[in-house]
Swiss-Prot record:
Family: Belongs to the bacterial ribosomal protein bS6 family.
Presence of the UniProt keyword Methyltransferase in the record: no
Family matches, as SUPFAM superfamilies: Ribosomal protein S6 (SSF54995)
Name used for this protein in its record: Small ribosomal subunit protein bS6
The protein's role, per its UniProt record: Binds together with bS18 to 16S ribosomal RNA.
Keywords: Ribonucleoprotein, Ribosomal protein, RNA-binding, rRNA-binding
Highest taxon in the source lineage: Bacteria
Length: 148
């Protein structure tokens, strides 16, 4: 049997218990066709990048699956029919990841930000002083400036 990672996006206006019931429903479909569910991760209610079927948020759920292709195809067919499922994606993998997925692990290596992505300028406001990369200024032509 092949290994798959499956991500499911459910509508925002249903409860977390209903999302869990959906996952159990699809688990039953998969097991009836000879497949097995592995790890199930609920990522919770997260904002969508763009609106999908008039929804701005969705419940994300990741499922590790060990099943034949026919069982996965039947589960996906059932998901297309269900109105509570906004989107899903099934990807075949060589092996399942151990531990938490990348979405749930905190990134401690991310530097602390003070709400500003720009590098700090020298103190003193707008005056940057001598830039150092330019040579000295040429003298002004005083005769041309007076007549104009």
């Amino acid at each position: 049997m092949a290994l798959y990672e499956h991500v499911l996006l459910a509508r925002q206006d249903i409860s977390q218990q209903q999302v869990d019931a959906l996952v159990e429903q699809f688990k039953g479909v998969l097991e009836a066709n000879g497949g097995k569910f592995g790890k199930v991760e609920n990522w919770g209610l997260r904002p969508l990048t763009y609106r999908i079927k008039k929804n701005r948020k969705a419940y994300y759920t990741l499922v590790n699956i060990d099943a034949p292709a026919a069982a996965v195809a039947e589960m996906e067919r059932q998901m297309r029919i269900n109105e509570d499922v906004l989107r899903f994606l099934t990807v075949r993998v060589e092996e399942h990841e151990e531990g938490q997925s990348a979405m749930l692990t905190r990134r401690d290596d991310r530097r602390e930000r003070d709400g500003d992505d720009r590098p700090r300028r020298r103190e003193g406001g707008f005056d940057r002083g001598d830039r150092g990369d330019r040579g000295p200024r040429r003298p002004r032509d005083t005769e041309a400036g007076e007549g104009a």
